[in-house]
From Swiss-Prot:
The keyword Repeat applies. Keywords: 4Fe-4S, Chloroplast, Electron transport, Iron, Iron-sulfur, Membrane, Metal-binding, Oxidoreductase, Photosynthesis, Photosystem I, Plastid, Repeat, Thylakoid, Transport. It comes from Porphyra purpurea. [4Fe-4S] cluster 1 binds at residues 11, 14, 17, 58. Apoprotein for the two 4Fe-4S centers FA and FB of photosystem I (PSI); essential for photochemical activity. FB is the terminal electron acceptor of PSI, donating electrons to ferredoxin. The C-terminus interacts with PsaA/B/D and helps assemble the protein into the PSI complex. Required for binding of PsaD and PsaE to PSI. PSI is a plastocyanin/cytochrome c6-ferredoxin oxidoreductase, converting photonic excitation into a charge separation, which transfers an electron from the donor P700 chlorophyll pair to the spectroscopically characterized acceptors A0, A1, FX, FA and FB in turn. Its cofactor is [4Fe-4S] cluster. One of its GO terms (cellular component) is chloroplast thylakoid membrane. GO terms for molecular function: 4 iron, 4 sulfur cluster binding; electron transfer activity; metal ion binding; oxidoreductase activity. PROSITE patterns: 4FE4S_FER_1 (PS00198), 4FE4S_FER_2 (PS51379). This is Photosystem I iron-sulfur center.
Amino acid sequence: MAHSVKVYDTCIGCTQCVRACPCDVLEMVPWDGCKAKQIASAPRTEDCIGCKRCETACPTDFLSVRVYLGAETTRSMGLAY
């Protein structure tokens, strides 16, 4: 089952999640919404293995990058009954 990777606007552009990902799912893209002028993006979610190393590496109090595994994807989107 596919995993979804969500990057929130609390991202500070530190690149920790990008460096932690063993599957190269994440990359940094230009964004003017933070001091670093870049934000994490997840263009290759089909390669995500669900290890959540990106979450562990995130230094923000509110995890800026979240991985939702299988059924969690459905629940997080409010689609579960």
